[in-house]
Amino acid sequence: MKLMRKNETREFLIEDIEFPAVGVAFYNDKKVYIKGAVPGQKVLARVSKVRREKIEAKLKEIVTNIPGAAQPKCPDFGVCGGCVHQFLPYEKQLEFKEREVLKLFKDAKIEGFEYLGILGSPEKEEYRNKMEYTFGDFVKGGELTLGMHAKNSGFSIVNTDKCNIVDEDFRIILKTVVEYFRKKDLPIYKVMQHVGYLRNLVVRKAKNTGEILIALVTTSQVDFDLTELTEILKSINYLGELKGILHVINDGLADMVRGDKIVTLFGQDYITERILDLKFKISLFSFFQTNSKGAEKLYSEVLEFLGDVSNKTVFDLYCGTGTIGQLASKKAEKVIGIELIEEAVEAAKENTKLNNISNCSFIAGDVAKVITEIKEKPDTIILDPPRPGVSPNAMKYVIKFNAPEIVYVSCNPKTLVNDLGVLRAYGYEVEKVKIVDMFPGTGHVETVVLLQRKII
């Protein structure tokens, strides 16, 4: 069989799937990875990388679909780079996600635990509480667009005003803003040249309270009066309640949403969400689970895994705005949360006051550094790290604490199994595993693991 070459387009039969939602075909006994493809499909894909150990290809067309496949409800599916599996019935999505995660556990030789299944999202559509949209154009020099990056493209932006993973308030805000700026002839920000004005639109909406926060992100390269746009956005008849409109000045070179300066154009600079009877203040850049209803399910599982922590001290590492820690404080004697992002810690402290919680404290700093300075010892540790997992330095001290139990909440099962391997090498056993889907239509998933220290 001849060698496969880069940019060659050919037909593949998808035989397996690996995290995150990457279909696997075979060529000369070598794996061919095709993002978005699923087992049972026959697809056309263009080869993008040829390596000694693997081949990567980009999905171009589905030649034969799997039984039960449906027409995606989103008109931009396949063009927008956001969702990958909207054509699959939800039960099939869960089946594939479960298969991907359990394969990682099997490959890492992690076994002997109680597997508690996969829990689906309460909402399959309109579940997101935050979106970061980008200004741009779909065709270079074309009409202004506002939305998500196009599939397999670093620069084309798809206008996503019909997106069905957010509710109507998001859609009307996006549509209003893009139509307004189409009449103003203002330059979009060009990342490579570092010139332009319009960068991003951020919308946050608390699903349980209905509170809405809108932020327009621009550079300082144009002096433009936003009073008219502010009044237009205030006049909309929302399903929820508009609480604030912000103007974020971002002159940074990186292609990411951040702020050098934040100006409040209307109202306040935060919204409040309610999760499991507690209130949480969410500012523009606060980390908060993007599926509020799903978060309630996820946190309920975490609390179940914690078990009886009365008379116990719980460390909540990578605590963000302190959501899990504050929920755990209702059961624990004491909770100490540690988080790198100072703004998130300030929000966590405000949330403890909001909820009249007195047994929960938060420290800002690098987890790896702060835990070396804490004199108290935890009875239980909650780990909820970002996608890269627990840093090696932090892991050293997690192990040194010698806590009887660890509850690990992971948004990346690949780094999860790596970290579990380290913890197992130092005397911990994986007791329980539960998968929780927070992101229908996408390849992402959460996993909750209970570890117990072996008595030697």
Curated annotation (Swiss-Prot):
Keywords: 4Fe-4S, Iron, Iron-sulfur, Metal-binding, Methyltransferase, S-adenosyl-L-methionine, Transferase. It is an enzyme of class 2 (transferase). Residues 3-61 form the TRAM domain. S-adenosyl-L-methionine binds at residues 289, 318, 339, 384. GO terms for molecular function: 4 iron, 4 sulfur cluster binding; metal ion binding; rRNA (uridine-C5-)-methyltransferase activity. Its EC number is 2.1.1.-. The active site is at residue 411. InterPro entries: MeTrfase_TrmA_AS, NA-bd_OB-fold, SAM-dependent_MTases_sf, TRAM_dom, U5_MeTrfase_fam. GO terms for biological process: rRNA base methylation. Transmembrane segments: none annotated. It holds the Pfam family tRNA_U5-meth_tr. Belongs to the class I-like SAM-binding methyltransferase superfamily. RNA M5U methyltransferase family. This is Uncharacterized RNA methyltransferase CA_C1435. It comes from Clostridium acetobutylicum (strain ATCC 824 / DSM 792 / JCM 1419 / IAM 19013 / LMG 5710 / NBRC 13948 / NRRL B-527 / VKM B-1787 / 2291 / W).
